[in-house]
Amino acid sequence: MGRVNDKVVLVTGGAMGMGLTHCTLLAREGATVYLSDMNEELGHQAVAEIRRQGGKAHFLHLDVTNENHWTGAVDTILAESDRLDALVNNAGILTLKPVQDTSNEEWDRIFEINVRSVFLGTRAVIEPMRKAHKGCIVNVSSIYGLVGAPGAAAYEASKGAVRLFTKACAVDLAPFNIRVNSVHPGVIATPMTQQILDAPQSARALLGPTLLGRAAQPMEVSQAVLFLVSDEASFVHGSELVVDGGYTAN
């Protein structure tokens, strides 16, 4: 307990799935969590549950593709908490289509949510972190930002972009003592992937290369996020933390 005591952390896409698990664990370990999402009902429910468990959490309605929303969110956090120690860029979507079946609109939508949001969020938090001369940004990518697989060209390209954007930011932001790292989960059992895992053929295709033979639980990925946000990772910068059950080793 207490691994991120008194840290102020903003998490995007925090109302459900992996994002909710990030928020729950960070709050349990002492952080004040600003849980952001487009879904206000689920967001408020999530905050209420975290508070019921003794954690400190606040909800922010945030469209991660909207620059003005980001400005407002950061201003709110600074007004209420006086600082922002960490940003977890978790929000993202998944579309399963091969490149030949992917429309321009689908490609643009994936990049808007999975890549533009990470850029906007990162840019929005730089100034308060620079003034404090410390900060931490964790970008949630994927193993499919490291390796290719059939049937998800736009998603994989977007997660690869997040990986390299993380490297670029690590170089740019090092003089301000802002650490930037990416997390690369393998197959995770979340509402977004459950339909795929419930189909035997697609489950075999996804889990076959995973050496541990199963999907990750969201908490197993959240532990990696917690580590990167914590001071335990004070010399971890520009890194890729892969949490994939051996998928990329196979």
Swiss-Prot record:
Reaction catalyzed: cyclopentanol + NAD(+) = cyclopentanone + NADH + H(+); cyclohexanol + NAD(+) = cyclohexanone + NADH + H(+)
Residues at the active site: 155
One Gene Ontology molecular-function label: cyclopentanol dehydrogenase activity
Any one Pfam family match given in the protein's UniProt record, by short name: adh_short_C2
Reported function: Catalyzes the oxidation of cyclopentanol to cyclopentanone and cyclohexanol to cyclohexanone. The activity toward cyclohexanol is 60% that of cyclopentanol.
Family assignment from sequence similarity: Belongs to the short-chain dehydrogenases/reductases (SDR) family.
Protein name according to UniProt: Cyclopentanol dehydrogenase
